Amino acid sequence: FLNDKPNRFNYKYTDPSLTGGDTKYSPAIKAGQFGFYAQDKWNATSNFNVTYGLRIDLPAVFNKPTANETFNQYAKSKNLDAQVGIVPSTKLMVSPRLGFNWYLTDDHKTLLRGGTGIFTGRVPFVWLSNAFNSNGVEMKSTTISKSVPGMNNYQQVLNNVVNASATSQKPDIAVVSKKFKYPQVFRSNLALEHTLPGDVKMTLEAIYSKTMNNVFFENLAINQVAKTYAVPGKENSAAPYYNSEKSDYYSIINLKNTNRGYSYALSALFEKTFNFGLDLAASYTFGHSKSVNDGTSSVAYSNWKYNYSRDTNGKGELGYSKFDIPHRVMVRVGWTSPKY
């Protein structure tokens, strides 16, 4: 890097012959998410009530990336089950929820509450946009390594790529599986609230989440071979070895699903409000979160390449999530002036 001689770099460019001469062309994904929610509450007694609801989400993509027939024929010949030019079909995402509040005493000093249900967040359409930006048609990208002749003359190398004369350069492709489902989780919680002597409010709570559908990225341009690497003396350290597929593509990142992953958290919260405006609160949370891929990047190739795993192309090895926070302590101090 300091000598201006990188090992490799990634180059993305527009093919003006397919964009009407527009060298700043950028494909746009047109998408939207429609949501509907209905909820009702049943007061069984003065101390017990149940809340139930149903949320329906309808994510939709209104256009498609330009089909790449050359790639599609290649994928078909290799039985890759991948195709440029498709997006997930529009499907209803049904998320039922159920919750309850149960006061264990008539003075309402002790409350047991909980709930369970399926949850869908805002759909991350940015992951789907890779199929538009890396379709190998209007927008092209390639990874250039030091093995390319004339690597030190960057401008010449780039000119060769754009002019399609550097036949050794392999484009990067991003596709979406025909069976891809938008992320959803199943989540349950149970909490006990109790007023201690001195009007100190205590809350003990447990939350558990299980992945139903999450993202998983695989590279179809590499093949696993009969080799493994392992750290001597370290159990479960064996990792498979992959070779690049002999093809015209540097990477083929396929977006699909995994149902592996979970998280849990146990917390204790203590709160005290004084009559002169002072509010105090302190809490401790213990928990763990495990996932296959957190999808922290907007770029498909980065989500695959930088995912820590012994077998990043495997069926889904669980590891600690990048959002895993095993211990968290929070203290809050607030004061409300009588003047206001």
PLM features: residue spans?
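Signature of Gram-negative outer-membrane beta-barrel scaffolds
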Residues: 1-107, 295-302, 307
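Extracellular loop and loop/strand-boundary signature of outer-membrane beta-barrel proteins
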Residues: 21-26, 39, 80-87, 175-178, ...
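Transmembrane beta-barrel architecture of outer-membrane proteins
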Residues: 28-36, 56-62, 90-96, 116-120, ...
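Residues on the lipid-exposed face of transmembrane beta-strands in outer-membrane beta-barrel proteins
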Residues: 36-42, 54, 98-102, 190-194, ...
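Short beta-strand segments enriched in hydrophobic/aromatic residues
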Residues: 44, 56, 102-104, 118, ...
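Repeated loop/turn-to-beta-strand initiation elements of outer-membrane beta-barrel proteins
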Residues: 48-50, 108-110, 199-202, 277-280, ...
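Solvent-exposed loop/turn elements at secondary-structure boundaries
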Residues: 66-95, 99-254
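Gram-negative outer-membrane beta-barrel transporters
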Residues: 203-340
